[in-house]
């Protein structure tokens, strides 16, 4: 399966995405020798487990949406989404400045536009212009769903959505997070399962709709969403 075949199943409005993914791969691997960005370095694995995986949410994102990626790391899922969906307005948030430096460098190499923020999620949310300011919030960060929901749902506009990227089997995790999601103003709309190409595993998108405003006390500070999740 070549790149064109792999990505043909995804909604895309960008005709030169193959070239941009090639640049992304080369820059990621080169920069990774200086800064630890990814443990996955095999080309096929990067394309499937990082690039293709990141793009799975494309079909659920409205045209021209304001999108923020929380805990983006090396740009996943936000940058691959922007590569195939140049219409979205993308914002990337990460707590480590070395990752933001890479993402600013990458933006010039890819010749695409996005904004970067060196910030913890709770600090980013404390800014009035960000709180409930985005149609779509995405995150592939490694954390329990109830923790991610507390960091991400406060950023979602009423009627917008939070899309959490998860591994294959998340039924128990979703069930254990339902109360937290309700408290935060969300409602699980869909749990969508995918098989990655080349038998590289399965993935799940948990799509949560914002049905009411999030109480002002969330997200809590002092790392409480992780230490004592809702």
Feature map (PLM): residue ranges:
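Residue-level signal for inorganic ion chemistry
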Residues: 28, 81, 103, 166, ...
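Short loop/edge segments at beta-strand edges and connector loops
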Residues: 41, 118-120, 190-192
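Conserved SAM/SAH cofactor-binding pocket of Class I
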Residues: 55-143, 149
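SAM/dcSAM-binding transferase cores
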Residues: 175-230
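Class I SAM-dependent transferase core
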Residues: 1-64, 98-101, 105-113
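Short alpha-helix immediately C-terminal to the canonical SAM-binding loop
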Residues: 99-101, 170, 174
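Short glycine-dipeptide loop
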Residues: 156-162
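Short strand-turn motif at the edge of the Rossmann-like AdoMet-binding core
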Residues: 165-169, 193
């Amino acid at each position: 399966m070549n790149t064109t075949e792999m990505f043909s199943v995804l909604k895309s409005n960008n005709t030169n995405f193959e070239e941009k993914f090639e640049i992304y791969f080369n820059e990621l691997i080169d920069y990774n020798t200086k800064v630890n960005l990814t443990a996955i370095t095999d080309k096929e694995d990067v394309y499937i487990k990082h690039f293709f995986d990141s793009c799975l949410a494309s079909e659920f994102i409205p045209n021209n949406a304001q999108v923020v990626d929380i805990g983006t790391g090396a740009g996943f899922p936000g940058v691959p989404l922007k590569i195939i969906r140049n219409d979205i307005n993308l914002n990337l948030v990460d707590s480590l400045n070395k990752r933001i430096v890479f993402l600013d460098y990458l933006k010039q190499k890819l010749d695409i536009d996005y904004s970067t923020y060196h910030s913890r999620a709770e600090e980013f949310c404390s800014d009035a212009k960000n709180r409930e300011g985005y149609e779509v919030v995405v995150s592939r960060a490694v954390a329990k769903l109830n923790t991610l929901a507390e960091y991400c749902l406060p950023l979602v506009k009423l009627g917008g959505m939070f899309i959490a990227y998860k591994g294959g089997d998340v039924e128990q995790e979703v069930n254990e997070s339902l109360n937290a999601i309700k408290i935060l103003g969300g409602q699980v709309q869909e749990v969508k399962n995918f098989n990655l190409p080349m038998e590289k595993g399965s993935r799940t998108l948990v799509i949560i709709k914002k049905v009411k405003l999030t109480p002002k006390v969330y997200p809590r500070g002092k790392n409480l969403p992780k230490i004592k999740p809702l």
